[in-house]
């Protein structure tokens, strides 16, 4: 059971996306992806071509679990990469779980189980990240 109570925000203003709060995770996160692999709601995947040794002209394309937190996940042709910094990846993952998913389906993706908190070798608490976002949302709302 997760000892940290997760307070999910209601509406998330777009200013949270550019907040400097994400810089902390550029320094702390090592991009191992453990948080994604234990998360019951993470669904990132990549495609992998497997060729059979019997006949190199025959094979299959497999869907393989992946992690938006690891190096190489956002690589594109021509040597580009969308999210090089770990803080940018953390922002993407967080906002996907509490903003994008909610906007599409009407509820948050994070269930607050705390598995990600338990496995992080850098002791980054995703539960606390969500609570920080909630506090930042309240701060922005109070300014307006």
What residue spans do the PLM features occupy?
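Ferredoxin-type iron-sulfur electron-transfer modules in oxidoreductases and energy-metabolism complexes
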Residues: 6-27, 45-144
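Internal, non-catalytic "lid/hinge" segments that mediate substrate recognition, gating
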Residues: 1-5
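Basic (Lys/Arg-enriched) interaction patch that binds polyanionic ligands
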Residues: 27-47
